[in-house]
Amino acid sequence: MSNKKEIVVTDWIKQNCHEGNFLNLTLSSDQRRVFRGKRKSDCNQELQLQLPREGKLNDGDILLTNQKKLFVQIIAQKENLIKITAKTSIELIKVAYHLGNRHVEIEINENILFTKSDYIIEELLRNFDVVYSKVEKKFFPEIGAFHHEKKSLS
């Protein structure tokens, strides 16, 4: 058991702030969608997230502790991914369709898709005229249409 006191993180600060004490908190794409629970900072400091349950934690977001004396910066963790490219846009769209149909998270960039490394996905990709390779990079998947961010549809 650690002798360090747990720090409670309660607020987002969207603007970049350079004053005060900082802790870095490196999180995977899955972990950046969870706003409550225990985490450990990069220097092993125990943190308790108690953030409003909306949106997502983005790479570079600055969070504030309940005592307003310490800042926590979110860092997107590098993950094992599959990079997918194709000769034509239509082939890449077909791959995106089939991945989405399987509820696979994808990051969409111009002429490139990224998804989490998985041998089943690699088998699927063999059925398409695409080039794919394993890479390690920060992963920023598209947010689904029905995520719980508060936005008006009008």
Swiss-Prot record:
InterPro entries: UreE, UreE_C_dom, UreE_N, UreE_N_sf. It is found in: Cytoplasm. Disulfide bonds: none annotated. Coiled coil: none annotated. The keyword Flavoprotein does not apply. GO terms for cellular component: cytoplasm. Keywords: Chaperone, Cytoplasm, Nickel, Nickel insertion. One of its GO terms (biological process) is protein folding. One of its GO terms (molecular function) is unfolded protein binding. CDD domains: UreE. Pfam families: UreE_C. Involved in urease metallocenter assembly. Binds nickel. Probably functions as a nickel donor during metallocenter assembly. Belongs to the UreE family. NCBIfam families: PRK13261.2-2. This is Urease accessory protein UreE.
